[in-house]
């Protein structure tokens, strides 16, 4: 995952590497705990259908790097590289209104809370030899 990759770069003492303009590249990041709750609620919907699961709040890749550095107690800056992809999608945001109405789904884990809860696993995975 992006969070693990950036976390491992930081734990290696390196500035996290992101595309130039990463403060403007937005994604609708969601915590797995919220995804599980949405799936449980989808077992008994008010109406059958296809449901979007997300937070409806897009956040930047830069925000992930900044939160990780704050949680890991570092200030390594950010290493920016040119984005090599033409037509790179700059913004995703889930419309969860139908999920809210028909499933009673509401995301509860913020990006900050999710990353904070993940720090011990990032450190554990970083120290694990998988070769």
Show which residues each predicted segment covers.
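Core catalytic loop region at the nicotinamide-binding pocket of NAD(P)H-dependent oxidoreductases
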Residues: 15-18, 42-53, 76, 126-131
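Residues within well-ordered alpha-helical secondary structure of globular protein domains
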Residues: 12, 41, 70, 105, ...
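Conserved C-terminal active-site "lid" loop/helix of NAD(P)H-dependent oxidoreductases
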Residues: 32, 62, 84-106, 110-113, ...
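Amphipathic terminal alpha-helices
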Residues: 111-131
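NAD(P)-dependent short-chain dehydrogenase/reductase
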Residues: 1-36, 40-43, 66-71
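Residues that recognize and position ribonucleotide moieties
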Residues: 28, 57, 92
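C-terminal "lid/loop" region of Rossmann-like NAD(P)-dependent oxidoreductases
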Residues: 20-22, 50-51, 60-66, 73-91, ...
């Amino acid at each position: 995952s992006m969070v693990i990759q950036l976390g491992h770069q930081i734990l290696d003492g390196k500035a996290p590497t992101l595309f130039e303009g990463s403060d403007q590249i937005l994604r609708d990041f969601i915590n797995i705990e919220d995804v599980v709750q949405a799936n449980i609620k989808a077992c008994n919907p008010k109406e059958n259908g296809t449901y979007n699961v997300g937070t409806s709040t897009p956040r930047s890749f830069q925000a992930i790097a900044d939160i990780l550095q704050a949680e890991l107690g570092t200030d390594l800056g950010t290493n920016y590289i040119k984005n090599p992809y033409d037509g790179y999608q700059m913004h995703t945001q889930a419309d969860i209104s139908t999920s809210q109405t028909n499933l009673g789904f509401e995301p509860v884990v913020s990006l900050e809370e999710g990353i904070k809860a993940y720090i011990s696993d990032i450190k554990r995975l970083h120290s694990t030899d998988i070769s």
